[in-house]
């Protein structure tokens, strides 16, 4: 499940209450008041989605309104910058995990199809011209190998960026004795990220750059595989016939004997969109 910004702001505040209470930075009365305030804000947002804000500077006034100004001590040693960075990394981490799961499903389908067609012989092409016979399994495993490399890159990203920016404040850090190790653990990270400047200025950008580049690589491999299939499907005597019906193919509105590869077209278009969106990420 991919959670939104409001969810993660709430989680960060809850983690701050627990961690700061353990470190005696909050007395028991203030900690309970802050916790009740966070729950109240969550309940208000559940009843009115317009209150499901995406920025901490809009969230904090709602907590103050539900409790009182004394709860602002919770923000000591923090900044909207380390909160924003933590929120972005946490959301991108969930999105990356979702991408891993989707890619696993694709790889699993390819491997199952390869197992089914170990002895199926098909033509392979270079420069659009039939070149050599090949087993369909071997051909499919070539694409599986490419997707597995993409999967490995995603794993590496998840490991590399599963470090928590929270508690870095902004730029030069803080002298307020926050327990960043506890904060990282409570938010599901392996450890805190060490350099405060990196935490708030570079980490969320780098994570987005790496994941978008891997997503684009997946898009290129998807496009390559679909192109091969569509070239064969378009021939007068294709050796690949798409299963009809559903979203897979649709009947031409003018030529009822014609079956257009709808799902292939849409998927290829989506893959191209991913590659173009990667360019946008690198341009920002």
Language model features by range: what are they?
Residues 1-173, 178-185, 248-252, 262-268:
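A helix-coil-helix interface module used to build multimeric assemblies
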Residues 70, 113-120, 190, 232, ...:
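A short secondary-structure junction motif
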Residues 138-235, 240:
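Internal metal/ion-chelating core segments
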Residues 204-239, 246-284:
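A conserved active-site cap/scaffold subdomain adjacent to cofactor or substrate pockets
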């Amino acid at each position: 499940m991919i959670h939104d910004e409001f969810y993660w702001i709430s989680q960060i505040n809850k983690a701050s209450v627990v961690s700061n209470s353990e470190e005696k930075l909050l007395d028991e009365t203030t900690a309970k008041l802050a916790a009740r305030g966070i729950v109240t804000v969550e309940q208000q947002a559940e009843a009115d989605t317009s209150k499901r804000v995406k920025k901490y500077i809009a969230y904090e006034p709602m907590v103050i309104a539900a409790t009182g100004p004394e709860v602002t001590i919770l923000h000591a040693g923090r900044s909207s910058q380390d909160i924003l960075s933590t929120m972005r990394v946490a959301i991108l981490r969930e999105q990356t995990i979702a991408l891993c799961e989707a890619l696993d499903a694709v790889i699993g389908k390819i491997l199952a199809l390869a197992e089914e067609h170990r002895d199926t012989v098909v033509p392979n092409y270079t420069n659009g011209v039939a070149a050599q016979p090949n087993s369909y399994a071997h051909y499919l495993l070539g694409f599986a190998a490419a997707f597995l490399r993409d999967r490995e890159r995603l794993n590496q990203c998840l490991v590399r960026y599963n470090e928590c920016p929270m508690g870095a404040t902004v730029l030069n850090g803080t002298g307020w004795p926050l327990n960043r190790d506890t904060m990282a653990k409570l938010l599901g990270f392996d450890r805190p990220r060490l350099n405060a400047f990196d935490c708030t200025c570079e980490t969320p950008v780098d994570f987005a750059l790496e994941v978008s580049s891997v997503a684009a690589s997946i898009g290129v491999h998807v496009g390559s595989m679909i192109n091969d299939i569509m070239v064969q499907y378009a021939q007068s005597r294709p050796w690949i016939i798409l299963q009809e019906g559903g979203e897979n193919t649709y009947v031409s509105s003018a030529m009822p004997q014609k079956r257009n590869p709808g799902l292939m077209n849409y998927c290829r278009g989506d893959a191209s969109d991913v590659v173009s969106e990667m360019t946008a990420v690198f341009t920002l």
